[in-house]
């Protein structure tokens, strides 16, 4: 019984400390872009939205202040990328919607289309 109580208390403290690390707030990048969303250690980490000075908007996941995971980037001219990100770059599976209604659906590597799609 003591072992069970110990495990319950330990799990409580672990979940409490983890949830305390993530908070909702705002962050301004060096280039002036404004982020609103989950923060960890004063940096974007988790889900959030960034509005860039150009008018571009990114909504999706961040890890240690960089776009990483699933996200959507809407360019100010109406073009859009929906897909995976790694280290602030389009990387992995994704779809790019062009202004002329064409689209590329396929793999991306370091911001470049990989293959024919």
Predicted regions and their residues:
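N-terminal segments that cap or nucleate solenoid repeat domains
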Residues: 20-57
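Sec-dependent N-terminal signal peptides
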Residues: 4-14
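Conserved anchor residues at repeat-unit boundaries in beta-strand-based tandem repeats, strongest
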Residues: 34-44, 57-68, 80-91, 103-115
């Amino acid at each position: 019984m003591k072992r069970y109580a110990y495990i319950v208390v330990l799990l409580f403290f672990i979940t409490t400390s983890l949830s305390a690390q993530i908070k909702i707030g705002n962050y301004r990048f060096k280039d002036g872009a404004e982020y609103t969303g989950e923060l960890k250690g004063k940096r974007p980490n988790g889900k959030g939205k960034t509005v860039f000075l150009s008018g571009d908007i990114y909504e999706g996941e961040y890890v240690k202040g960089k776009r990483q995971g699933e996200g959507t980037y809407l360019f100010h001219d109406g073009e859009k990328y929906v897909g995976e990100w790694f280290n602030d770059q389009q990387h992995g599976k994704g779809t790019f919607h062009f202004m002329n209604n064409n689209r590329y659906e396929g793999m991306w590597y370091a911001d470049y289309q990989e293959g024919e799609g």
